[in-house]
């Protein structure tokens, strides 16, 4: 992952940039599993920890790339105090 991508991901903590890029981050295994089940538009998964087999299978079924990142980088991208090490980049759905 290059520095430009890291900056873009960390910028998504601010609403202005979420609106500009039309993307947002979700964090945690459970919420990512729920997003996959509901058909959310997940662009990419980032993992610094072991993913559950069900998440890997669902990501592969939806052709979602999974990028392994080190824990330090996951903490930098995360907006939580104690990050789970699993993040997903999602597209904001278009309003009808």
Q: How would you name each of these model-derived features?
A:
Residues 1-55:
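Boundary-proximal intrinsically disordered activation/regulatory segments immediately upstream
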Residues 2-3, 48, 70-73, 96:
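General structural signal for secondary-structure boundaries
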Residues 29, 94-96:
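A short, well-structured juxtamembrane/interface segment
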Residues 59-94:
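Glycine/small-residue-rich loop that forms an oxyanion/phosphate-binding "nest" at active or ligand-binding sites
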